[in-house]
Amino acid sequence: MLPPIRDLARRTLETPFGRLVRHFLVRLVRGGLDAASTEVELGVGALLGLLAMPGAFTCFIVIDKYSSFLSWYRGRFHQDYLLVSLPDKYLFLALAMTVTGIVTVLKWDKILPDPQDYLNLAPLPIRSRTVLLANATAIAVAVLVFAVDVNAVPVVFFPFFVTGAAQTGVGWFVQFAATHAACVMLATIFTFCAVFALLGTLSALLPREAFRACSSWVRAVFLVAFLMLLVSGFTGPQAFLRQLQAHPDSPVRFLPSLWFLGLYQSLQQRATPALAELARMCLPGGGLAFGLMVGSYALGYRRRFAAVLEGGRRPSDQRVFALLLRFLDLFSARASGFERACHRFTVRALLRNEAHRVSLAVALGLGWLAAYQNGALRAPFATAYLLVLGLRVGFELPAGAAAAWIFRATLDPRENETLPAARR
């Protein structure tokens, strides 16, 4: 049975459509093939292994909760583990959605075609619809593999721990594992569709220069939001559920993580009326996210190809960018020399590259969150620390060069001339 399937897969990959799908898959997960790339990239094996780690570690974090000996020692007898495990179900849902959302935001530029794709594929006798369908197929395959990889370990171990504590049979374990797999997979796919739909809609509606200007900040907002979702997973959904029971019209009902928690409990027949109501929002919410993703993908694909032909203005020609540079130049040294030149060059390099802008925007977002939660005296210190941390991360990211730079600076290592510029 396997050899015919293997032969069919090999023949499919050798077709022009199969080669296109393989090309787009490699571009989604390639590691270090593009010298001008500013992303921190990993190979396929390292990426899949890294993405599987959070779920695996989380399983062993919650293992003591389902120890039969500890339950007996604490005097907890005859517990309904389908209800006891509710916070952990929410934790795994939040973890799956967080990892999926962060990777989708970071890989956003690799999902749509870039100038290299157009220059390589446009001269070939291939219809644009075939290229679009091949890219869509590659995205679907990548999302499916990604969803399975992120949730593979928790799908086995978490139901095993819960059913072992409840001392039930194999049938209940299989049912629990199937329910867990369905809910976390649906949450993973929904997160990808939602992030893609929102970013794609902004890309399709906003002018190209406006989207390029605000893309880094929008992605940073998504990253901060997903980090907050992860924190809520460790704190538990109890506060959300209490607020929802007290105020059914609360904005909390629009949290997708609670939708899938309600679906989880409904499939196991342990849902409260509030959770049962939230479970009904999974279908319309998922359908809306998928529809927006398909529409924005088609429009964004066409606009990205048009952008390659038309080109774009340099960042230095944009008015807002020029005003920001003039303001930041006020912090440089007044006297001409290496320190002033190094400061001006570093500022422009940090604001020019997408990865550096995202790093700074995430630091500013976390700083705002820390300032909102801390008192008036501690807020400036927390914000300044996170901003310095974001700058330090930005210094470690490589800056992509659009052309070969012929200028070099020869420095005396004993003078440490770059330190004053970095401090400014």
Question: Predicted regions: what is each one?
Answer:
Residues M1-G101, F146-L391:
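Transmembrane alpha-helical segments and their membrane-interface loop/helix boundaries
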Residues V103-L124, L391-T410:
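Transmembrane helix boundary and interhelical loop/hinge segments in multi-pass membrane proteins
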Residues I111-L112, L121-A134, I139-A140, A204:
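A conserved hydrophobic secondary-structure block that centers on an alpha-helix together
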Residues I126-T130, R314-L323, D412-P413:
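Membrane-cytosol interface motif
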Residues S128-P159, R414-R424:
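Selective transmembrane-helix segments that form parts of the transport pathway or gating/packing helices
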Residues A134, N353, L360-A363, G400, ...:
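Generic beta-strand/beta-sheet core signal
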Residues S203-P207, R408, D412-T418, R424:
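Short, well-ordered loop/turn and helix-capping segments at boundaries between secondary-structure elements
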Residues V358-L360, N374-L377, F395-G400, A404-I406, ...:
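Extended hydrophobic-aromatic, low-complexity segments
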